Amino acid sequence: MTDQEIIALWEAGQQERAFNEIVRNYSERLYWHVRRFVCSHEDTDDLLQEIFSKIWAALPSFRGEAQLFAWLYRIATNETLNYLRKQKVRASLRFQSLDAAMERRIDEDPYFNGTEAQRLLTKAIARLPEKQRIVFSLRYYEEMKYEDIAAITGTSVGALKASYHIAYEKLKAEFQDLV
């Protein structure tokens, strides 16, 4: 079902069916979007429940000014960033680096089934600053256009291109050291 059909269902009073279609169409994509930042299967599942709860609560205010997928990704991204900020505060209270904790989670994650190179890339991306990590993940993994990322993040296309380039150069430099 297309996003336009989902919106039409919602507007026709079939809110529950429309929401179920959103969950069906976007669960996996949003899961992997969140997982790239959270690095834990269990935390991602918990966060996804919160995200879909926020989506359900916010759907009546969706005005169609943005594409549905961009609106959903924006909610998911904002909730994920809020979660990471809370984790960072908790980590600082425990005198431990959030980056180090995320790297440890990647190493210990029983659900990670990638190669060693993928594990190293995931860890390197986790060390990028928040904005660069978001832009790189959406562009590289989700293969989104800069215009769509701009709609999700509320950032200009030029700034996104610069962030992506800087992230790419940092990752390239890190992997050149390994070769």
Regions of interest found by a model, annotated:
Residues 1-29, 36, 126, 148, ...:
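N-terminal module of bacterial RNA polymerase sigma factors
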Residues 26, 163-166:
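Residues within the DNA-recognition helix of helix-turn-helix
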